[in-house]
UniProtKB/Swiss-Prot annotation:
Gene Ontology MF terms: DNA binding; serine-type endopeptidase activity
The name this protein goes by in its record: LexA repressor
Enzyme class: hydrolase
EC number: 3.4.21.88
DNA-binding region: 28-48
Catalytic activity: Hydrolysis of Ala-|-Gly bond in repressor LexA
UniProt KW Hydrolase keyword: yes
PANTHER family membership: LEXA REPRESSOR, LEXA REPRESSOR-RELATED
Organism name: Providencia rettgeri
Site (Cleavage): A87, G88
Disulfide linkage: none
Record note on quaternary structure: Homodimer.
Cytoplasm found in the keyword field: no
Amino acid sequence: MKALTARQQQVYDLVRDHISQTGMPPTRAEIAASLGFRSPNAAEEHLKALARKGVIEIVSGASRGIRLLLEEETEDQGLPLIGRVAAGEPLLAQEHIESHYQVDPELFKPHADFLLRVNGMSMKDIGIMDGDLLAVHKTQNVHNGQVVVARIEDEVTVKRFKQQGNRVELIAENPEFEPIVVDLRQQNFTIEGLAVGVIRNSDWY
Protein backbone atom coordinates (compact mmCIF):
# COMPACT_ATOMS: atom_id res chain seq x y z
CA MET A 1 0.00 0.00 0.00
CA LYS A 2 1.27 3.46 -0.88
CA ALA A 3 1.56 5.97 1.97
CA LEU A 4 -1.33 8.39 2.37
CA THR A 5 -0.94 12.15 2.43
CA ALA A 6 -2.13 13.95 5.58
CA ARG A 7 -5.34 15.06 3.81
CA GLN A 8 -6.01 11.58 2.42
CA GLN A 9 -5.53 10.15 5.92
CA GLN A 10 -8.10 12.65 7.26
CA VAL A 11 -10.61 11.57 4.62
CA TYR A 12 -9.95 7.89 5.30
CA ASP A 13 -10.28 8.40 9.08
CA LEU A 14 -13.54 10.30 8.61
CA VAL A 15 -15.03 7.55 6.43
CA ARG A 16 -13.97 4.84 8.85
CA ASP A 17 -15.23 6.74 11.91
CA HIS A 18 -18.56 7.48 10.21
CA ILE A 19 -19.03 3.78 9.39
CA SER A 20 -18.11 2.85 12.97
CA GLN A 21 -20.57 5.33 14.48
CA THR A 22 -23.52 5.13 12.06
CA GLY A 23 -23.09 1.81 10.26
CA MET A 24 -22.82 3.48 6.84
CA PRO A 25 -20.26 5.55 4.90
CA PRO A 26 -20.67 9.34 4.63
CA THR A 27 -21.85 11.05 1.44
CA ARG A 28 -19.45 13.25 -0.53
CA ALA A 29 -21.34 16.30 0.79
CA GLU A 30 -20.90 15.13 4.39
CA ILE A 31 -17.17 14.61 3.84
CA ALA A 32 -16.85 18.08 2.30
CA ALA A 33 -18.76 19.71 5.17
CA SER A 34 -16.79 17.90 7.89
CA LEU A 35 -13.35 18.65 6.43
CA GLY A 36 -14.03 22.12 5.04
CA PHE A 37 -13.85 21.32 1.33
CA ARG A 38 -15.48 23.85 -0.99
CA SER A 39 -17.57 21.24 -2.78
CA PRO A 40 -18.42 17.52 -2.80
CA ASN A 41 -16.28 17.25 -5.95
CA ALA A 42 -13.17 17.88 -3.85
CA ALA A 43 -14.17 15.00 -1.58
CA GLU A 44 -14.68 12.81 -4.66
CA GLU A 45 -11.13 13.54 -5.87
CA HIS A 46 -9.67 12.48 -2.52
CA LEU A 47 -11.78 9.31 -2.56
CA LYS A 48 -10.51 8.48 -6.05
CA ALA A 49 -6.94 8.94 -4.82
CA LEU A 50 -7.62 6.56 -1.91
CA ALA A 51 -9.10 4.04 -4.36
CA ARG A 52 -5.97 4.27 -6.55
CA LYS A 53 -3.86 3.52 -3.48
CA GLY A 54 -5.93 0.43 -2.74
CA VAL A 55 -7.38 1.36 0.66
CA ILE A 56 -11.01 1.87 -0.42
CA GLU A 57 -13.31 0.73 -3.20
CA ILE A 58 -15.79 3.17 -4.76
CA VAL A 59 -19.11 1.51 -5.62
CA SER A 60 -20.55 3.35 -8.62
CA GLY A 61 -24.13 4.62 -8.59
CA ALA A 62 -24.46 4.98 -4.81
CA SER A 63 -24.02 8.21 -2.85
CA ARG A 64 -22.59 6.22 0.07
CA GLY A 65 -20.79 3.66 -2.08
CA ILE A 66 -17.48 3.43 -0.22
CA ARG A 67 -15.93 0.18 1.00
CA LEU A 68 -12.85 0.05 3.24
CA LEU A 69 -10.44 -2.55 1.86
CA LEU A 70 -7.65 -1.99 4.37
CA GLU A 71 -9.92 -2.92 7.29
CA GLU A 72 -10.87 -6.22 5.65
CA GLU A 73 -7.23 -7.21 5.13
CA THR A 74 -6.15 -6.59 8.72
CA GLU A 75 -9.12 -7.45 10.92
CA ASP A 76 -8.38 -11.20 10.98
CA GLN A 77 -4.81 -10.72 12.19
CA GLY A 78 -5.73 -8.94 15.42
CA LEU A 79 -4.41 -5.60 16.59
CA PRO A 80 -0.83 -4.80 15.55
CA LEU A 81 1.55 -4.01 18.41
CA ILE A 82 3.85 -1.11 17.59
CA GLY A 83 7.20 -1.09 19.34
CA ARG A 84 10.06 1.37 18.92
CA VAL A 85 9.46 3.75 16.00
CA ALA A 86 12.32 4.66 13.68
CA ALA A 87 12.84 8.36 12.96
CA GLY A 88 10.90 9.60 9.96
CA GLU A 89 9.04 6.33 9.34
CA PRO A 90 5.23 5.95 9.36
CA LEU A 91 3.98 4.66 12.71
CA LEU A 92 2.30 1.61 11.17
CA ALA A 93 5.21 0.72 8.89
CA GLN A 94 5.67 -3.05 8.77
CA GLU A 95 9.07 -2.91 10.45
CA HIS A 96 7.55 -1.31 13.58
CA ILE A 97 5.00 -4.10 14.13
CA GLU A 98 6.35 -6.48 16.78
CA SER A 99 3.38 -8.85 16.69
CA HIS A 100 -0.42 -9.02 16.61
CA TYR A 101 -2.70 -9.54 19.61
CA GLN A 102 -6.13 -11.13 19.35
CA VAL A 103 -7.94 -8.30 21.10
CA ASP A 104 -11.43 -7.29 19.98
CA PRO A 105 -11.10 -3.69 18.69
CA GLU A 106 -14.73 -3.06 19.63
CA LEU A 107 -13.89 -3.42 23.34
CA PHE A 108 -12.76 0.19 23.09
CA LYS A 109 -14.85 3.25 22.22
CA PRO A 110 -14.08 4.40 19.61
CA HIS A 111 -12.59 1.14 18.37
CA ALA A 112 -8.84 0.50 18.60
CA ASP A 113 -6.73 0.24 15.45
CA PHE A 114 -3.40 -0.68 17.01
CA LEU A 115 -1.53 -1.12 20.28
CA LEU A 116 1.49 0.99 21.20
CA ARG A 117 4.05 -0.16 23.76
CA VAL A 118 4.44 2.64 26.32
CA ASN A 119 7.99 3.80 27.03
CA GLY A 120 8.51 5.78 30.25
CA MET A 121 6.47 7.00 33.23
CA SER A 122 5.32 10.44 32.04
CA MET A 123 1.62 9.40 32.18
CA LYS A 124 1.69 7.30 35.36
CA ASP A 125 -0.79 9.46 37.29
CA ILE A 126 -3.62 8.30 35.01
CA GLY A 127 -2.50 4.69 35.13
CA ILE A 128 -0.42 4.47 31.95
CA MET A 129 2.80 2.75 33.03
CA ASP A 130 6.10 1.88 31.38
CA GLY A 131 5.67 -1.26 29.28
CA ASP A 132 1.86 -1.08 29.13
CA LEU A 133 0.06 -1.56 25.83
CA LEU A 134 -1.90 1.55 24.88
CA ALA A 135 -4.94 0.95 22.67
CA VAL A 136 -5.07 3.66 20.01
CA HIS A 137 -7.82 4.76 17.61
CA LYS A 138 -6.14 6.09 14.48
CA THR A 139 -7.48 9.58 13.81
CA GLN A 140 -6.28 13.15 13.46
CA ASN A 141 -9.55 14.57 14.78
CA VAL A 142 -8.89 15.20 18.48
CA HIS A 143 -9.98 17.74 21.08
CA ASN A 144 -8.32 19.60 23.93
CA GLY A 145 -7.97 17.47 27.04
CA GLN A 146 -7.79 14.13 25.24
CA VAL A 147 -4.78 11.81 25.55
CA VAL A 148 -3.15 11.43 22.15
CA VAL A 149 -0.27 9.75 20.39
CA ALA A 150 1.62 12.58 18.71
CA ARG A 151 4.71 12.91 16.57
CA ILE A 152 6.94 15.96 16.99
CA GLU A 153 9.55 16.03 14.26
CA ASP A 154 10.79 12.41 14.49
CA GLU A 155 9.75 11.62 18.08
CA VAL A 156 6.53 9.81 19.04
CA THR A 157 5.01 10.57 22.45
CA VAL A 158 1.85 9.96 24.49
CA LYS A 159 0.51 13.08 26.22
CA ARG A 160 -2.62 15.08 27.00
CA PHE A 161 -3.40 17.45 24.12
CA LYS A 162 -4.06 21.19 24.39
CA GLN A 163 -4.07 23.58 21.42
CA GLN A 164 -4.52 27.32 21.23
CA GLY A 165 -3.96 28.76 17.75
CA ASN A 166 -0.53 27.74 16.48
CA ARG A 167 0.63 26.66 19.94
CA VAL A 168 0.22 23.08 21.12
CA GLU A 169 1.02 21.85 24.62
CA LEU A 170 1.55 18.16 25.25
CA ILE A 171 1.01 17.71 28.96
CA ALA A 172 2.38 14.84 31.04
CA GLU A 173 0.46 13.23 33.91
CA ASN A 174 3.51 13.20 36.16
CA PRO A 175 4.79 16.36 37.93
CA GLU A 176 8.38 15.36 37.18
CA PHE A 177 7.82 16.06 33.46
CA GLU A 178 7.46 19.54 31.97
CA PRO A 179 4.90 20.13 29.20
CA ILE A 180 6.21 19.89 25.64
CA VAL A 181 5.43 23.10 23.75
CA VAL A 182 5.10 22.92 19.96
CA ASP A 183 5.01 25.89 17.59
CA LEU A 184 3.04 24.66 14.57
CA ARG A 185 4.58 27.38 12.40
CA GLN A 186 8.10 26.08 12.96
CA GLN A 187 7.87 22.38 13.87
CA ASN A 188 6.54 19.28 12.14
CA PHE A 189 3.67 17.96 14.24
CA THR A 190 1.22 15.13 13.55
CA ILE A 191 -1.52 13.48 15.58
CA GLU A 192 -1.16 9.72 15.10
CA GLY A 193 -4.20 8.71 17.13
CA LEU A 194 -6.38 8.92 20.22
CA ALA A 195 -5.72 6.81 23.33
CA VAL A 196 -8.83 4.71 24.01
CA GLY A 197 -7.64 2.23 26.62
CA VAL A 198 -4.68 0.56 28.28
CA ILE A 199 -3.70 -3.07 28.81
CA ARG A 200 -1.41 -3.77 31.78
CA ASN A 201 1.87 -5.29 30.69
CA SER A 202 1.41 -8.08 33.27
CA ASP A 203 -1.90 -9.12 31.67
CA TRP A 204 -0.02 -10.98 28.94
CA TYR A 205 2.09 -13.18 31.22
